[in-house]
Amino acid sequence: MSQTSFNKAQFQAALTRQWQHFGLQSASEMTQRQWWRAVSGALSELLSAQPVAKATEGERHVNYISMEFLIGRLTGNNLLNLGWYQQVSDELQAHDVNLTDLLEEEID
């Protein structure tokens, strides 16, 4: 599976749209919870803009969903798996926001 690319300019634009959606004049006005919501929304926007890989013809697969346990927080792991953790962290550092602290806002 190929690595999904991170676009810094698109992330910055998506982040700006998120804090403007809150009715704020600048990102510096956001609370920690608003930062969490803004980053989550921006990441969702970036991922939904990624092209969907086409399945190989004739290829079959099985999807299995288990409700046996709750797996907890996933954003940090997903950023690591995408190879985006450091880039997102760097972008947030420009706003004096620590990604590790921000990930604590995620609800279990």
Swiss-Prot record:
Catalytic activity: [(1->4)-alpha-D-glucosyl](n) + phosphate = [(1->4)-alpha-D-glucosyl](n-1) + alpha-D-glucose 1-phosphate
Keywords in alphabetical order: Allosteric enzyme, Carbohydrate metabolism, Glycosyltransferase, Pyridoxal phosphate, Transferase
EC number: 2.4.1.1
SUPFAM superfamilies: UDP-Glycosyltransferase/glycogen phosphorylase
Cofactor(s) demanded: pyridoxal 5'-phosphate
Top class in the EC scheme: transferase
UniProt entry tagged with the keyword GTP-binding: no
Statement: the UniProt record of this protein carries the keyword Transferase: yes
A GO term, aspect molecular function: 1,4-alpha-oligoglucan phosphorylase activity
Function as written in the Swiss-Prot or TrEMBL entry: Phosphorylase is an important allosteric enzyme in carbohydrate metabolism. Enzymes from different sources differ in their regulatory mechanisms and in their natural substrates. However, all known phosphorylases share catalytic and structural properties.
Family assignment from sequence similarity: Belongs to the glycogen phosphorylase family.
Name of the protein in its database record: Maltodextrin phosphorylase
Native source species: Klebsiella pneumoniae
The gene coding this protein: malP
